[in-house]
């Protein structure tokens, strides 16, 4: 055991018409990583809030019935929150903000699978670095291609290049994109003072998350994680911890049709209005 102090952790997952297969894979991986965490820490009962944003919710905890024994053994309590409709990703997570009693809170997408050492590595980093309020993991697609979850402050030009230019033209801006996506980060050691991280996986110091008042609910989808990253950064460091590893299905707004593109542009407009416009100059 590294530490005999009880460690409190909670998890929230916002889903929208998510498949049972996808959610089972996530919860199964969560059980495995919690089991490894318990080998290093005394972990209190762990609430996992499944927040179902579906307009006609069909999700039932019966989906997980066949590994209820594993959940019980690791003292993981699934709590289903539904009936509120599609309120958006950020507001969905905020629905349980006033129910968080843990020292650490993990925000997750449903299309995630966690490596077995993921939580042990993340919690150890946070326990060892008291000024860190949020940790972001190494992520890859199912095919093993790396995702870049850490970002510098964006410019409008960079978003246009990444989202709308064909691959051939996008290659002309490879240095700009690499700078924005922080390709220079090492995957061996933790990197500190990251400006912005993806909302698909945010391991947060709960106190800082609550002080930041969670997500800005004016963002229905997209940029809510950028905004929260910057506001969380007012209370401490955001670190990239590559020893935390996940698999993430992911997706790009500009490739999901007009409705997603419209939401992306509306949220982007709000983000830049709030935090400052940069049309061409790329931070970093």
Predicted segment positions?
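Short, well-formed alpha-helical segments that are part of the catalytic scaffolds
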Residues: 18-40
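Conserved donor NDP-sugar-binding/catalytic core segment of glycosyltransferases
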Residues: 116-149
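A conserved acidic beta->alpha catalytic loop
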Residues: 49-63
């Amino acid at each position: 055991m590294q530490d005999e102090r009880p460690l409190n952790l909670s998890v929230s997952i916002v889903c929208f018409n998510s498949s049972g297969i996808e959610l089972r894979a996530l919860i199964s991986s969560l059980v495995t990583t919690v089991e490894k965490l318990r080998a290093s820490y005394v972990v209190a009962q762990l609430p996992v809030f499944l927040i179902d944003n579906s307009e006609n919710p069909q999700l039932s905890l019966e989906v997980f019935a066949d590994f209820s024994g594993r959940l019980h053994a690791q003292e993981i309590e699934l709590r289903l929150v539904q009936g509120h409709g599609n309120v958006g990703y950020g507001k969905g997570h905020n629905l349980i903000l006033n129910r968080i009693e843990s020292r650490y809170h993990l925000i997750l997408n449903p299309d995630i699978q966690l490596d077995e050492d993921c939580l042990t590595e993340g919690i150890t980093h946070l326990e060892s670095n008291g000024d860190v309020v949020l940790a972001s993991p190494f992520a890859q697609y199912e095919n093993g291609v790396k995702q870049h979850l850490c970002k510098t402050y964006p410019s409008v030009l960079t978003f246009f290049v990444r989202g709308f230019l064909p691959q051939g033209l996008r290659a002309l801006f490879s240095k700009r994109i690499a700078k924005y996506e922080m390709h220079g980060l090492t995957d061996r050691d933790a990197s500190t003072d990251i400006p912005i991280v993806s909302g698909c996986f945010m391991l947060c110091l709960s106190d800082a998350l609550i002080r930041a008042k969670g997500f800005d609910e004016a963002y229905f989808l997209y940029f809510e994680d950028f905004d929260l990253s910057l506001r969380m950064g007012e209370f401490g460091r955001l670190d990239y911890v590559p020893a935390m590893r996940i698999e993430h299905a992911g997706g790009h707004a500009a490739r999901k049709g007009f409705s997603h593109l419209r939401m992306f542009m509306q949220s982007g407009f709000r983000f830049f209005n709030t935090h400052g416009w940069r049309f061409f100059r790329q931070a970093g």
